[in-house]
Amino acid sequence: MKKVFCLLVVFCSFLLCSCDVPQGMRELLAYQGGDFACEAVLSGEKPIALTISRVGDEIIIKPEGMEHIGDAAFVFDEEGAWICSGKTRIKLEKTQLQRLCTVYEMFTLDSAKAWRITEEKPGGIEIYKCESDGNTVYIDANTLLPLRFSAGGEELDVKKFEMAE
């Protein structure tokens, strides 16, 4: 009986060691370290299509329909927050600003925090579901690219994600 148990323990150890599972969140969040371009939809009462990119240290979030504004800047004053370019000023509602900040946070997740990583297969697609401090990121197990984010009551579905060369 002891031999069977020992054999079973050795076999299980072999299976665990041979699994192709990433080292941890540092590897799973590696896409955050380089330049990328992403198309996503922020769900909610009013879904917003977004283009999100990283160039160097900057993360640029452009809502669909804002292309005509060109080089825009966020301006904060006593009346609130605005997106401005030249003479064009568009007031951002508090909820819109909070939603954009949540999107930014989704692309600057901290791999050093304690994460709970589980493997799932919804619809036959292998993914890693990673949860920490109210943030959840779903990562494709084959490409190690993000598929969906959830944070602060917001859901961001990634439609397209490309790493820069």
List each model region and its residues.
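Flexible, processing/modification-adjacent segments and terminal tails
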Residues: 23-37, 82-134
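N-terminal leader/targeting segments and the immediate start of mature chains
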Residues: 14-58, 66-68, 88-95, 110, ...
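Sec-dependent bacterial lipoprotein signal peptides
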Residues: 1-17
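Gly/Pro-enriched, hydrophobic low-complexity segments
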Residues: 60-68, 113-165
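Short, hydrophobic/proline-enriched secondary-structure or compact coil segments at domain edges
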Residues: 37-39, 80-81, 145-151
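An acidic-aromatic
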Residues: 51-105, 151-157
